[in-house]
């Protein structure tokens, strides 16, 4: 098979500004980043200095026009996604309306041009930048809620322009339909799902699209890997379990993410509590709380997510180091591409470098297609056989033999030590023991554990009532257990009136 990969920047990615890892963006014509050096002695250094991957659509022997037509056809023919659009924009601007009006913010001399057409929010500072977008920390105007949010401003002229040729790299803006698809899916999957970044609002003006989401205060899991080199098995399990719960929630609804990677995992920070007054090691794992500063983990960036029809998709896309082999070797692929990506993430968490790395792109694709990776010494010497077994089942080249999401959540290693355990309890509530409960019960068990130590620090009745949220799931939705098969009969909804109620702690926000 002849593979001729080309990379197409999707143009609406979140590029966080961090001092810990180098990356290049498509705006500078450098959308290809340095790959990990094949010399195993330099693995961690290479990963830290040049391995940040932007979200790229990977086009393997598929013309951009054919790929675009395929995606557009699926969107236009999918009445349920049209319903999502109607639901999202019912209280916002209509799809065909734009506005040249500026916000009512008093100053006319704005620091950021994006502020001129933005309503109801004040941009405070830039926290990220992409080829056709910038991300800002912002606060609401004329509202009692002053909690900061993240706003991604996507410039229209950037995403509607024709393909721009940069040497051998082809950079193409995303269509308006793709932006609306991202918004629709983000709103749907984040509803009552604590492990996806929360969608707040969407605005469209004459020159920009604005996506308003929650501000996740800890940063990327990628940066913690760079800082800590690698995670302990307990900490890796703590992170990957939450990622799996987020993917489970999406797969319930027939949605595949297609870009799971450390750069797309954010976390809420937790403080370090030393023993007997001594500061603990930064990467030490605390039962029921977390470690490495990592508490609640959230999946972000739904620009490549898609609601599947007939349980399969055919558009090749993703981030090459984390993309499953069938994406570029088969005509169609299933939700199990997310499981491959989870395997790549778990591998990276445990040893500090990804399973597939190669300077030459064709060689890299061949390695992925063969599942050619190794548990190299010394990084894997002290990692348990259970962890290696979980990785092996996730990085199975044959998708029919690969773990699905339920297989992974039932994996013995994932259940051998429980990051969901409440440290007040002497018993373990393992993932396996609660799989027969609803999604929100599993998530709530985790939140109870994560919040336990915070509750001890601030145990007043006022703080408990003011800093809590509720997670809901209807009794009718309990039949969604197990792997998703077929199209949902109706939109996946969680109804307040008929739900079981679960309370979780929400930590106060301190950011940048």
Swiss-Prot record:
Question: Which terms does the UniProt entry file under GO BP?
Answer: cellular response to oxidative stress; mitotic DNA damage checkpoint signaling; regulation of meiotic nuclear division
Q: Which domain of life is it from?
A: Eukaryota
Keyword terms of this UniProt record: ATP-binding, Calmodulin-binding, Kinase, Nucleotide-binding, Serine/threonine-protein kinase, Transferase
In which residues is ATP bound?
Answer: 127-135, 152
Chain spans, region Calmodulin-binding: 502-512
Q: Which Gene3D superfamilies match?
A: Transferase(Phosphotransferase) domain 1
Q: Which residues form a coiled coil?
A: none
Recall the GO molecular function terms of this protein's record: ATP binding; calmodulin binding; protein kinase activity; protein serine kinase activity; protein serine/threonine kinase activity
* SUPFAM superfamilies in the record: Protein kinase-like (PK-like) (SSF56112)
Q: Which reaction does it catalyse?
A: L-seryl-[protein] + ATP = O-phospho-L-seryl-[protein] + ADP + H(+); L-threonyl-[protein] + ATP = O-phospho-L-threonyl-[protein] + ADP + H(+)
Question: Protein kinase domain spans which residues?
Answer: 121-414
Enzyme kind, highest EC tier: transferase
The catalytic residues are 259
Assigned EC number:
2.7.11.1
Instruction: Write down the Pfam families for this protein, in alphabetical order.
Output: Pkinase (PF00069)
| A cellular-component GO term for this protein | nucleus
| Family classification | Belongs to the protein kinase superfamily. Ser/Thr protein kinase family.
Identification of the protein by name = Serine/threonine-protein kinase RCK1
UniProt organism field = Saccharomyces cerevisiae (strain ATCC 204508 / S288c)
């Amino acid at each position: 098979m002849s593979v001729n990969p080309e990379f197409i920047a999707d143009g609406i990615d979140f590029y966080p500004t961090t001092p810990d890892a180098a990356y290049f963006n498509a705006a500078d014509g450098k959308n290809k980043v340095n790959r990990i050096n094949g010399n195993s002695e330099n693995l961690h250094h290479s990963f830290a200095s040049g391995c940040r991957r932007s979200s790229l659509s990977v086009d393997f022997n598929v013309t951009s026009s054919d790929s675009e037509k395929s995606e557009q056809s699926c969107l236009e023919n999918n009445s349920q996604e049209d319903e999502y659009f109607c639901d999202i924009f019912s209280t916002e601007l209509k799809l065909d309306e734009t506005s040249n009006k500026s916000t009512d913010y008093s100053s006319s001399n704005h620091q950021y041009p994006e502020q001129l057409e933005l309503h109801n929010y004040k941009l405070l500072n830039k926290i990220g930048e992409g080829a056709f977008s910038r991300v800002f920390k912002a606060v609401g105007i004329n509202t009692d809620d002053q909690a900061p949010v993240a706003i991604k401003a996507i410039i229209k002229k950037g995403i509607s322009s024709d393909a721009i040729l940069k040497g051998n790299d082809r950079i193409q803006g995303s269509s308006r339909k793709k932006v609306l698809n991202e918004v629709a899916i983000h709103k749907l999957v984040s509803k009552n799902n604590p492990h996806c970044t929360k969608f707040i609002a969407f605005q469209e003006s004459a020159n920009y699209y604005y996506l308003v989401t929650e501000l996740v205060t800890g940063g990327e899991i990628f940066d913690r890997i760079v800082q800590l080199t690698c995670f302990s098995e307990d900490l890796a399990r703590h992170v990957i379990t939450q990622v799996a719960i987020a993917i489970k929630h999406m797969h319930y609804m027939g949605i595949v993410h297609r870009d799971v990677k450390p750069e797309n995992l954010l976390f809420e920070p937790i403080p370090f509590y030393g023993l007997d007054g001594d500061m603990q090691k930064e990467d030490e794992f605390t039962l029921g709380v977390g470690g490495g500063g990592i508490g609640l983990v959230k999946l972000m960036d739904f620009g490549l997510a898609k609601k599947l029809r007939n349980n399969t998709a055919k558009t090749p896309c993703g981030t090459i180091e984390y993309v499953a082999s069938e994406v570029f070797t088969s005509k169609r692929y299933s939700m199990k591409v997310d499981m491959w990506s989870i395997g790549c993430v778990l591998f990276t968490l445990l040893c500090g470098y990804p399973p597939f790395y190669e300077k030459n792109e064709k060689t890299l694709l061949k390695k992925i297609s063969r599942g050619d990776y190794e548990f190299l010494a010394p990084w894997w010497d002290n990692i348990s056989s259970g962890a290696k077994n979980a990785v092996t089942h996730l990085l199975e080249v044959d998708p029919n033999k690969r773990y699905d999401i339920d297989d992974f959540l039932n994996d013995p290693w994932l259940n051998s030590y429980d990051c969901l355990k409440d440290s007040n309890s002497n018993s373990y509530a393992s993932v396996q023991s609660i799989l027969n409960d609803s999604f929100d019960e599993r998530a709530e068990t985790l939140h109870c554990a994560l919040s336990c130590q915070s509750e001890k620090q601030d145990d007043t009745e006022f703080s408990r009532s003011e800093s809590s949220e509720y997670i809901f799931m209807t009794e009718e939705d309990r039949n969604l257990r197990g792997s998703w098969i077929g199209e949902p009969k109706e939109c996946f909804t969680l109804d307040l009136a008929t739900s079981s109620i679960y309370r979780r702690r929400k930590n106060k926000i301190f950011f940048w």
